[in-house]
């Protein structure tokens, strides 16, 4: 599989080939993904919750994102690597936003993703002008869950729906190459997808987007809580627990290590 580029990503919208994206946070996972046909890896700030054990993504730092982006990039996957910009790494001013986006690219990402709507237009323009591809993110934006009143579906009111449409158009105009739409009503995501010339990637927003993204821990059945919009394709949590328990039994009953697991001196 050859390296997926921004141009390939955008082309998939015109050819109506669905885009596939998953999160990854470490070298072993990225190495496994590199041997699949997945289109894109998101080094998501969701690592704060599924890797670092925080209650939300607000505690994730640039240092965290750089470290995990480097780990993923070391696997040299052909997939397009997109790295999340963490909370307060791009909101303060455009100068720091460009600097932090550049640090993620230097760490190995092919593009960055940031949350927010029309209020992020100038920031997006500045980062794109600096030569860094930007993916947008609207709908439920986890870094803004306090302002949104919690983790909820966005677009219930006419005002919210109109704002989502406006946000998507403003972000496209600002230069984003793709847009994540999270936890909105399916008809809204469909309208946005039809209006935009750039590909949309859904998570919890229905089947009419140009692609889908999931947190890999949800897909693998590793999460303590799986959102309603995620699907677990295997229960790795159970498989891992069973393996650990079998190891404990084998050690306690002197069934491990076996002869092939150690060396004896020759007599």
Curated annotation (Swiss-Prot):
Coiled coil: none annotated. Its cofactor is Mg(2+). It is an enzyme of class 2 (transferase). The keyword Transferase applies. CDD domains: KPHMT-like (cd06557). Pfam families: Pantoate_transf. Pathway: Cofactor biosynthesis; coenzyme A biosynthesis. Mg(2+) binds at residues 45, 84, 115. Keywords: Coenzyme A biosynthesis, Cytoplasm, Magnesium, Metal-binding, Transferase. It is found in: Cytoplasm. It catalyses: 3-methyl-2-oxobutanoate + (6R)-5,10-methylene-5,6,7,8-tetrahydrofolate + H2O = 2-dehydropantoate + (6S)-5,6,7,8-tetrahydrofolate. GO terms for biological process: coenzyme A biosynthetic process; pantothenate biosynthetic process. One of its GO terms (cellular component) is cytoplasm. Binds 1 Mg(2+) ion per subunit. 3-methyl-2-oxobutanoate binds at residues 45-46, 84, 113. The active site is at residue 182. Its EC number is 2.1.2.11. GO terms for molecular function: 3-methyl-2-oxobutanoate hydroxymethyltransferase activity; magnesium ion binding. The keyword Nucleus does not apply. Homodecamer; pentamer of dimers. Belongs to the PanB family. Catalyzes the reversible reaction in which hydroxymethyl group from 5,10-methylenetetrahydrofolate is transferred onto alpha-ketoisovalerate to form ketopantoate. This is 3-methyl-2-oxobutanoate hydroxymethyltransferase. It comes from Saccharolobus islandicus (strain L.S.2.15 / Lassen #1). The lineage of its organism: Archaea, Thermoproteota, Thermoprotei, Sulfolobales, Sulfolobaceae.
């Amino acid at each position: 599989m050859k390296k997926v580029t921004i141009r390939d990503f955008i082309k998939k919208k015109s050819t109506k080939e669905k885009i596939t994206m998953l999160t990854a946070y470490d070298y072993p996972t990225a190495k496994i993904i590199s041997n699949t046909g997945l289109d894109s890896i998101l080094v998501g700030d969701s690592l704060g919750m599924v890797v670092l054990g925080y209650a939300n993504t607000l505690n994730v730092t640039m240092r965290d994102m750089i470290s995990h982006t480097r780990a993923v990039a070391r696997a040299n996957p052909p997939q397009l690597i997109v790295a999340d910009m963490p909370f307060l790494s791009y909101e303060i001013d455009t100068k720091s936003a460009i600097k932090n986006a550049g640090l993620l690219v230097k760490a190995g990402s092919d593009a960055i993703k940031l949350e927010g709507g029309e209020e992020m237009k100038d920031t997006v323009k500045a980062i794109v002008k600096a030569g860094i591809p930007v993916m947008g993110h609207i709908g439920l934006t986890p870094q803004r869950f306090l302002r949104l009143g919690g983790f909820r579906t966005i677009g219930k009111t006419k005002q919210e729906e109109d704002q989502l449409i406006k946000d998507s158009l403003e972000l496209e105009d600002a230069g984003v190459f793709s847009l994540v739409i999270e936890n909105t009503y399916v008809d809204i995501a469909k309208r946005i997808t039809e209006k935009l010339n750039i590909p949309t990637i859904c998570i919890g927003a229905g089947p009419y987007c140009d692609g889908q993204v999931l947190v890999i821990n949800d897909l693998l059945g590793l999460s303590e809580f799986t959102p309603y919009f995620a699907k677990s394709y295997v229960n790795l949590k159970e498989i891992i627990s069973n393996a650990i328990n079998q190891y404990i039994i084998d050690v306690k009953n002197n069934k491990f290590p076996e002869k092939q697991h150690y060396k004896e001196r020759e007599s």
